[in-house]
């Protein structure tokens, strides 16, 4: 039975519908007040809401099914559960949610603190945050005060402490000398209080340590805590203090199907988040943000109108002038998000026409190859989704050959990646016709097809399978391609530099008697580079090696 015929047989009742791709894979889940009407709209090209996304869903779908429910609320719940469990590729519910970092406290006997973008079911999460630099700086400050671990070591075995312990950044529960309750009370609980908005205890503690060292005439450590106090205050001020009273709020602004959330904890704005939803209903967004997204609920959620969710938490209009001002800010953020999202969609639509693409380039993957005279060859893959970088999907690839042949490296990269991964809508390569042909040939060898676009380094000439294009220097399409190329280049080079540092360190260590493979591995893991070893103390190196004599020999040679 074809899809259109099945749509015609659907009842005029509320329910959830599912489009399946190959191998019964979920590609889109939606809900409808009247299933038949909604499904038929997918096959009506004259429908004003017919879009590139709908066209892509219908073209890719191999099967259609639906589930009838009693009412719209039941449909909303079922839709949310199916999306959460199956993550269909064309569902953009709470699009951009994976871009935002969270702080995770792991559920372990000795919890670790991590910065993550994708949440599992095992941890305790704080966030999301918009500014990853803020998160890194915050963790850096707090680790110096509370000495929690950030590593992924197996805590079931006692081991020697790493460099973090000697730098007074970790209490080293890995040694087996700490009780779990002691570690949690001294390192994790104070961190939780800061992440919930209470920073006064931390400020007092840093100031107390600074004064204590100054009184003992230990001016070096007093200066260290003075600098830490200034840094911590600056980090928190970057987020902005907006309320004099202690209040934990989420303020949600809406413009069309764009939403903005201001997260306020303890009087600080700790997040300014932007999302898009297929629906323009405020209730749908709230449900997806808190129930499906599993984001923490504050004391109150400020909205443009009152909503009854049968919950103890207040969901409704501003209760004072300050909350009115915050709601206005959230609306302005949502409006700006809608505007920039519209610009991105226009740009991607123009790319289809100008570059002669077969598909709307919702997902673009960019390649770059880096090597040093054929040695240490690496490749990077960067991912752009809806015109924005999706950094949690970036990947590095290493190659063992010593050849200087970017074409063969590209071919190997394509085969390795797309033998296992799904193709994007467009592949971008740093190079011209030769690089494009290498990618196309590799795809053919594994029985796949995809639009491939390149950018020649000289004169920024755009290359496609149809030939070369010279776009104006200020063309948004050219600027987008340059941005993808530069990002792929940056990502490949950063990884290459890291490998070169490790290679240089490994070569130097090979020349020192008494440094075998095991000790060499320990030094590389602990310090990472020659520069870091040079700046380490004799005691720090000796602790890693278990030998002061060897540590002294290393320092003398460096």
Curated annotation (Swiss-Prot):
Residues 12-92 form the GIY-YIG domain. It holds the Pfam family UVR. It comes from the Bacteria. Residues 200-235 form the UVR domain. Its main location: cytoplasm. One of its GO terms (cellular component) is excinuclease repair complex. One of its GO terms (molecular function) is DNA binding. CDD domains: GIY-YIG_UvrC_Cho. PROSITE patterns: GIY_YIG, UVR, UVRC. Keywords: Cytoplasm, DNA damage, DNA excision, DNA repair, Excision nuclease, SOS response. It is found in: Cytoplasm. InterPro entries: GIY-YIG_endonuc, GIY-YIG_endonuc_sf, GIY-YIG_UvrC_Cho, RuvA_2-like, UVR_dom, UVR_dom_sf, UvrABC_protein_C, UvrC. HAMAP family: UvrC. The UvrABC repair system catalyzes the recognition and processing of DNA lesions. UvrC both incises the 5' and 3' sides of the lesion. The N-terminal half is responsible for the 3' incision and the C-terminal half is responsible for the 5' incision. Interacts with UvrB in an incision complex. NCBIfam families: uvrC (TIGR00194). Belongs to the UvrC family. This is UvrABC system protein C. It comes from Pseudothermotoga lettingae (strain ATCC BAA-301 / DSM 14385 / NBRC 107922 / TMO) (Thermotoga lettingae).
């Amino acid at each position: 039975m074809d899809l259109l015929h099945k749509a015609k047989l659907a009842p005029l009742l509320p329910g959830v519908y599912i489009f399946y791709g190959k191998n019964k894979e979920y590609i889109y889940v939606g809900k409808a007040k009247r299933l038949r009407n909604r499904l038929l709209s997918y096959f009506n090209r004259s429908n004003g809401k017919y879009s590139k996304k709908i066209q892509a869903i219908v073209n890719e779908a191999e099967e259609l099914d639906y589930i009838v429910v009693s009412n719209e609320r039941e449909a909303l719940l079922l839709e949310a559960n199916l999306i959460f469990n199956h993550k269909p590729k064309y569902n953009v519910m709470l699009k951009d949610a994976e871009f935002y970092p969270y702080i995770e406290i792991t559920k372990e006997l000795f919890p670790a603190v991590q910065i993550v973008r994708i949440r599992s079911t095992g941890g305790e999460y704080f966030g999301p945050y918009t500014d990853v630099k803020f998160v890194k700086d915050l963790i850096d400050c707090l680790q110096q005060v509370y000495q929690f671990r950030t590593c992924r070591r197996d805590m079931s075995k006692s081991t020697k402490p790493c460099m973090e312990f000697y730098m007074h950044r970790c209490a080293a529960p890995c040694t087996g000398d700490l009780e779990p309750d002691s570690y949690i009370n001294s390192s994790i609980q104070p961190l939780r209080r800061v992440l919930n908005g209470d920073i006064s205890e931390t400020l007092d503690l840093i100031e107390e340590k600074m004064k204590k060292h100054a009184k003992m005439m230990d001016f070096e450590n007093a200066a260290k805590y003075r600098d830490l106090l200034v840094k911590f205050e600056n980090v928190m001020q970057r987020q902005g203090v907006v309320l004099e009273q202690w209040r934990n709020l989420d303020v949600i602004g809406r413009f069309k199907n764009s939403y903005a959330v201001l997260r306020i904890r303890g009087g600080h704005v700790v997040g300014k988040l932007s999302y898009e939803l297929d629906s323009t209903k405020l209730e749908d967004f709230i449900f997806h943000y808190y129930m499906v997204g599993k984001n923490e609920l504050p004391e109150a959620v400020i909205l443009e109108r009152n909503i009854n969710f049968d919950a103890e938490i207040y969901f409704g209009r501003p209760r004072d002038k300050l909350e009115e001002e915050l709601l206005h800010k959230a609306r302005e953020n949502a409006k700006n998000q809608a505007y920039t999202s519209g610009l991105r969609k226009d740009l991607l639509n123009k790319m289809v026409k100008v570059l002669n693409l077969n598909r709307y380039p919702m997902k673009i993957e960019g390649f770059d190859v880096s090597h040093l005279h054929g040695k240490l060859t690496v490749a990077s893959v960067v991912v752009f989704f809806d015109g924005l970088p999706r950094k949690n999907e970036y990947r590095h690839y290493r190659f063992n050959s010593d050849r200087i042949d970017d074409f063969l490296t590209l071919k190997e990269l394509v085969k390795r990646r797309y033998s296992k991964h799904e193709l994007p809508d467009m592949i971008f390569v740093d190079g011209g016709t030769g690089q494009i042909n290498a990618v196309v040939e590799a795809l053919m060898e594994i029985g796949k097809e995809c639009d491939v676009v390149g950018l020649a380094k000289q004169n920024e000439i755009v290359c496609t399978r149809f030939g070369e294009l010279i776009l104006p220097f200020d063309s948004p399409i050219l600027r987008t391609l340059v941005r993808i190329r530069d990002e792929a280049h940056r990502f490949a080079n950063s990884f290459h530099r890291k490998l070169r540092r490790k290679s240089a360190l490994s070569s130097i260590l090979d020349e020192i008697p008494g440094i075998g493979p095991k000790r060499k591995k320990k030094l590389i893991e602990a310090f990472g580079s020659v520069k870091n070893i040079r700046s380490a103390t004799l005691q720090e190196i000796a602790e890693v090696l278990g030998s002061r004599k060897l540590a002294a020999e290393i320092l003398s040679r460096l």
